[in-house]
């Protein structure tokens, strides 16, 4: 079981050996899941210019529920299956996801969690991300890859997903612990969250996602992560749901807990962007006076 759980992260060394050995193909697919605010960086353009050999671009803007008023909500089973099938991913493919964020990893855990939410277990995040891949001198290319289409069957695992109604009910029942991965100022309500007044769900504990990464942008050790959860009095033997602003960085909490042997962390997909619009005022905790 430890080995199976350990696959949630792969090292740049492991992946570069797989690339050099020509293993990228039907059995191993590499996906760049980068997303940046459009005014800052163009993820697709950067991918075209430079990516891991054999990688495809996993577009989080495309692979989502476009009918939702909230950003980046989980797509339907059929949409996800069709989308990843076109990237050459079948149910037997080992998928490795990465992104090019300067932190090391930002959006990749969201893609990792999406695959898991749709029943795919063989999925890993590249530890250290593209930033460290380049820094360590591993190969990059501008060559587009043309993966042969594959058939992917998606089955949503509802235990990994929480809705607004479940999160509301939990404020009273406290059936599950809630960890919020946003920066402290947004959690406390002292700084604006991209135009939204900020704050948090009553009872939530704050563990900013960047605190799970080392200065170099790698995931902290399992011992360090376990200590972080202990310090916040989060019990990994009990139900846990992660939240953030739009369901992206919450997936860092799911990944961190997974590395500690807890694979069942749910993500509240709507997160603060939905909570802000739908929850009654007394359900929005803020330190702003």
Curated annotation (Swiss-Prot):
GO terms for molecular function: 3-mercaptopyruvate sulfurtransferase activity; 5S rRNA binding; thiosulfate-cyanide sulfurtransferase activity. PROSITE patterns: RHODANESE_1, RHODANESE_2, RHODANESE_3. The active site is at 244 (cysteine persulfide intermediate). Coiled coil: none annotated. SMART domains: RHOD. This is Thiosulfate sulfurtransferase. Expressed in numerous tissues.
């Amino acid at each position: 079981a430890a080995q199976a759980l350990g696959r949630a992260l792969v090292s740049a060394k492991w992946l570069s050996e797989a690339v050099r050995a020509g293993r990228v193909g039907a059995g191993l697919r590499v996906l760049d899941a980068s997303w940046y605010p459009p005014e800052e960086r163009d993820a697709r353009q950067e991918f075209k210019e430079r990516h891991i050999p054999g990688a495809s671009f996993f577009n989080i803007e495309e692979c989502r529920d476009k009918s939702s008023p909230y950003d980046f909500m989980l797509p339907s089973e059929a949409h996800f299956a069709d989308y990843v099938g076109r990237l050459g991913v079948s149910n037997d493919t080992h998928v490795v996801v990465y992104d090019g964020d300067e932190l090391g990893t930002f959006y990749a855990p969201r893609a990792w969690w999406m695959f898991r939410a749709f029943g795919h277990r063989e999925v890993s995040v590249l530890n250290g991300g593209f930033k460290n891949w380049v820094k360590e001198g591993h190969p990059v290319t501008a060559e587009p890859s043309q993966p042969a289409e594959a058939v992917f069957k998606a089955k949503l695992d509802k235990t990994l997903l929480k809705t607004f109604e479940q999160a509301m009910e939990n404020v009273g029942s406290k059936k599950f612990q809630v960890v919020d991965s946003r920066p402290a100022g947004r959690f406390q309500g002292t700084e604006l969250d991209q135009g939204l007044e900020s704050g948090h769900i009553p009872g939530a504990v704050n563990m900013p996602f960047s605190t799970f990464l080392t200065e170099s942008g790698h995931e902290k050790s399992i011992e360090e992560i376990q200590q972080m959860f202990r310090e916040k009095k989060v019990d990994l033997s009990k139900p846990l749901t992660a939240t953030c602003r739009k369901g992206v960085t919450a997936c860092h909490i799911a990944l961190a807990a997974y590395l500690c042997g807890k694979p069942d962390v749910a993500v509240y997909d709507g997160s603060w962007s939905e909570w802000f619009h739908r929850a009654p005022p007394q359900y929005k905790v803020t330190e702003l006076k």
